Amino acid sequence: MLDTGLLLVVILASLSVMLLVSLWQQKIRGRLPPGPTPLPFIGNYLQLNTKDVYSSITQLSERYGPVFTIHLGPRRVVVLYGYDAVKEALVDQAEEFSGRGEQATYNTLFKGYGVAFSSGERAKQLRRLSIATLRDFGVGKRGVEERILEEAGYLIKMLQGTCGAPIDPTIYLSKTVSNVISSIVFGERFDYEDTEFLSLLQMMGQMNRFAASPTGQLYDMFHSVMKYLPGPQQQIIKVTQKLEDFMIEKVRQNHSTLDPNSPRNFIDSFLIRMQEEKNGNSEFHMKNLVMTTLSLFFAGSETVSSTLRYGFLLLMKHPDVEAKVHEEIEQVIGRNRQPQYEDHMKMPYTQAVINEIQRFSNLAPLGIPRRIIKNTTFRGFFLPKGTDVFPILGSLMTDPKFFPSPKDFDPQNFLDDKGQLKKNAAFLPFSTGKRFCLGDGLAKMELFLLLTTILQNFRFKFPMKLEDINESPKPLGFTRIIPKYTMSFMPI
């Protein structure tokens, strides 16, 4: 039996050999992007401001350039900062950067299944089917427009019922936007007081809040250990199972009344495809159906409702902007009909305001992580297969080369000298490349129709002085959150 001293020598020698081999392989293949030196296991955790990771990454980009490496715990991440680096990776080398990176909170639920959190051939097949099915059910067409307007009508009635009293608009918007995606996925809407519906919203909100919390950030870095430890993460693990069980039951209900010749909703279309492809290698199976449906709910609920909620705050802070939107609504739509999506072509100022709300809010500045699917050379650096990549979309939204005063809320960022809408290459709120948000068409339609319908019926009122409005999103780890507030919807 080896004594302790000899055993220690053997271990140190083995580690030294492994390190030398790793360094030799790196030298042969090429060099990794530069970055701060990580500590064992905890990586660069102590060098990051965990309350505002985006600011820390901005500071690191000033030192290391637009492509650099950080370690979030034991996980190596390559960061892409600025328009040029992001475009070169996600567009010019789209295939190599098409994998889905690690997001521990959501991976606890999705585990690599479903359209949003899968990679490789699975992601390609599910994405093709999802885009085609959403298109079949009217996304970007009149069919979904009618569903949005129907839901907008219910929202207006709810807001009228507040009689101008100050309210937090969060739950009102969440119910409305979630019901739009529900009508597409399930083929029906929920009553706003339906306990099943409220439970679904509560569980999704719980996961989103945990992911943005300090504990959620630690879990993202050290989930391999924390999943075995007591703490809030254990409750989230239970929530993920409840969400999966909820969606399994919804699929079962659809399956029991399925007519293969007449699909009623997204679930029906997926079930029919499952029946058509029964070979063992098909990606069209129950697990992917359940997780794709959940993916659509997460993507289709939070983003639009949060953007609108932040938009209300910005319009109250800038009443001159709200007044111009009211004026354009009066000129183009009037008071005697509902808005239509085709109206946005005649309403450049309103569309510029919506774009500027998205840009200024910058609620997910780090974007959604990508993953390198094969050994890749990028800007002279070697990126091994399996490396996670953060395309920092927030760096595009605040680039003074594209937005002269990025810290100011200014719809003129999207208007030319004639007051017409202009494109801005750095405005990529739905990302770009092969993994851009497949619900971007739906989100754009919702933002325009819901905002114009609300402003056609109400003026916004803040219960305190305008100077008391805090319009700056609050940094929270990997994300930014909207300040809590109340407001009044004053009937016109």
Swiss-Prot record:
Entry-annotated residues carrying Phosphoserine: 130
Record: residues binding heme: 437
Keywords: Endoplasmic reticulum, Heme, Iron, Membrane, Metal-binding, Microsome, Monooxygenase, Oxidoreductase, Phosphoprotein
Cofactor(s) in the UniProt record: heme
UniProt-listed GO biological process terms: coumarin metabolic process; epoxygenase P450 pathway; xenobiotic metabolic process
Membrane-spanning ranges: none
Entry's EC annotation: 1.14.14.1
Classification via InterPro entries: Cyt_P450 (IPR001128), Cyt_P450_CS (IPR017972), Cyt_P450_E_grp-I (IPR002401), Cyt_P450_E_grp-I_CYP2A-like (IPR008067), Cyt_P450_sf (IPR036396), Cytochrome_P450_fam2 (IPR050182)
Enzyme class: oxidoreductase
Induction and repression of expression: By 3-methylcholanthrene (3MC).
Tissue: Liver and testis.
Annotated catalysed reactions: an organic molecule + reduced [NADPH--hemoprotein reductase] + O2 = an alcohol + oxidized [NADPH--hemoprotein reductase] + H2O + H(+)
Any one of the GO CC terms: cytoplasm
Single GO term (MF): oxidoreductase activity, acting on paired donors, with incorporation or reduction of molecular oxygen, reduced flavin or flavoprotein as one donor, and incorporation of one atom of oxygen
Major site of localization recorded for this protein: endoplasmic reticulum
Disulfide bonds: none
Role description: Highly active in the 7-alpha-hydroxylation of testosterone, progesterone and androstenedione.
Record PANTHER family: CYTOCHROME P450 508A4-RELATED (PTHR24300), CYTOCHROME P450-RELATED (PTHR24300:SF103)
Family as reported in the entry's similarity comment: Belongs to the cytochrome P450 family.
Name of the protein: Cytochrome P450 2A1
Species of provenance: Rattus norvegicus
